[in-house]
Amino acid sequence: CSLCFHSAKVEVQGKALTEHDMRPYKGSRMISPEEIIDKTSGYPTASLMFYREMVDALPDFYNHAPIADIPLQLLAANRGWAWYMDEPMCVYRLGGAASWTTLMKQGNYEKKQQDYAAAMTEMYRGFDAFSGGRFHNTVEHAIKRLIFLTQVNTKHFDTVLNKENREFYRELNARTRFFIRFETSAPKLYAW
């Protein structure tokens, strides 16, 4: 086992609406390296447990990443499977004034999202080289998901609703899909 992690309770600060739990999977189970690399939802960073030796010498793809948690997960995936515990044992705070998400929404949000997607794409490709291409197809699929989610975040719904993105669209929760459909079919009512 290269990584253990668990679910989290979500504590919302401010006016954000979200799920009350952060549960990447339903039920405790083994997670394959491919699932770690190309996951449909995030892992609570505070829950990540791994061997210290994994971070003794960090590769370039880690050092140049805009965030640290996903590259850590990729390092773990390169070492093997993970164990997920479907038990909330930490709190994931959402909407704090100094949080990464809040800071991303200040200023030119679209440019920040595009820059983030470009940096993460470079990071994934760096991991692909680091792992000797063992997970190449999985990495490329993860990049497609990342680009899709960037389009969701920046409200490029024509791309989001494109037939080629149907797989990723179906992974969105029902609330998000409802609001995308509402905003695209009744934009004046949505803006009201």
Residues of each region from the PLM?
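Catalytic core of nucleotide-sugar-dependent glycosyltransferases
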Residues: 27-31, 35, 88-96, 102-134, ...
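Conserved donor NDP-sugar-binding/catalytic core segment of glycosyltransferases
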Residues: 1-19
